[in-house]
């Protein structure tokens, strides 16, 4: 199990690593690792990418968390960051997120050259791109639900609370929202926004949601004296 944990921690920054190593001592996490070690199918994402969200910035630079549900079941798509993919053909959920971005910023319509590794650039700006469940079996959704990742996510929020941070939680889909909001209760250090999941399975709900997604995030950040997110990573000029 130690070997598997070492793979998970590949590239993780020191302050996040210290938190994860403390979690790894707990019974729930030991049981999670044991289950993962005994899985006969291929894991997605690969082990060295499971904790990739924690490789871009220190905890005290966390601005917001964008939550998905669980990783893409296709190993070619999953890369450790929720919704992100380095595959040549973008997954439908990521395509629809880009379309929503262009819907809110019409000047970006038709701009496709910046989509490669787009969400990695968001992560570099202080966004934790997390799934409620960090792993699954290849080509199987929700295979590791209720294995312990939910508890890890809740303890992560406790850790952020201990850092005296005021963090925006953005939920794309109800599965993660349900257990996270139950955990944080009325904690004043967290604000939240809720949207439908961008999967095609939700139909037009993601596009028809009346509140802006990306613009509302930046309005919140500016209100709390944070630099707004450049959703195009500096590759396209537009107004926040």
UniProtKB/Swiss-Prot annotation:
Keywords: Cytoplasm, DNA damage, DNA repair, Hydrolase. It comes from the Bacteria. GO terms for molecular function: uracil DNA N-glycosylase activity. GO terms for cellular component: cytoplasm. It is found in: Cytoplasm. SUPFAM superfamilies: Uracil-DNA glycosylase-like. CDD domains: UDG-F1-like (cd10027). Pfam families: UDG (PF03167). Gene3D superfamilies: Uracil-DNA glycosylase-like domain (3.40.470.10). One of its GO terms (biological process) is base-excision repair, AP site formation via deaminated base removal. Its EC number is 3.2.2.27. The keyword Thylakoid does not apply. It catalyses: Hydrolyzes single-stranded DNA or mismatched double-stranded DNA and polynucleotides, releasing free uracil. The active site is at residue 70. Excises uracil residues from the DNA which can arise as a result of misincorporation of dUMP residues by DNA polymerase or due to deamination of cytosine. Belongs to the uracil-DNA glycosylase (UDG) superfamily. UNG family. PANTHER family: URACIL-DNA GLYCOSYLASE (PTHR11264:SF0). This is Uracil-DNA glycosylase. It comes from Mycoplasma pneumoniae (strain ATCC 29342 / M129 / Subtype 1). The gene is ung.
């Amino acid at each position: 199990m130690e070997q598997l944990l070492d793979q998970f921690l590949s590239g993780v920054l020191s302050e996040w690593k210290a938190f994860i190593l403390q979690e790894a001592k707990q019974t729930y996490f030991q049981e999670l690792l044991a289950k993962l070690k005994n899985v006969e199918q291929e894991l997605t994402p690969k082990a060295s990418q499971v904790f990739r969200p924690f490789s871009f910035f220190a905890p005290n630079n966390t601005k917001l968390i964008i939550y998905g549900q669980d990783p893409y079941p296709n190993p070619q798509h999953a890369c450790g960051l929720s919704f992100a993919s380095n595959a040549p053909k973008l997954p439908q959920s990521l395509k629809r997120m880009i379309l929503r971005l262009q819907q809110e910023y019409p000047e970006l319509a038709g701009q496709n050259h910046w989509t490669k590794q787009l969400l990695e650039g968001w992560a570099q700006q202080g966004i934790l791109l997390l799934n409620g469940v960090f792993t699954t079996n290849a080509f199987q959704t929700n295979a590791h639900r209720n294995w312990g990742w939910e508890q890890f996510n809740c303890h992560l929020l406790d850790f952020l609370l201990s850092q005296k941070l005021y963090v925006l939680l953005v939920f794309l889909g109800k599965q993660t929202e349900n257990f996270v909001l139950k955990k944080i209760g009325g904690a004043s250090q967290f604000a939240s926004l809720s949207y439908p999941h961008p999967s095609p399975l939700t139909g037009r709900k993601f596009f028809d949601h009346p509140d802006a997604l990306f613009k509302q995030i930046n309005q919140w950040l500016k209100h709390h004296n944070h630099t707004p997110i450049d959703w195009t990573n500096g590759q396209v000029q537009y107004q926040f």
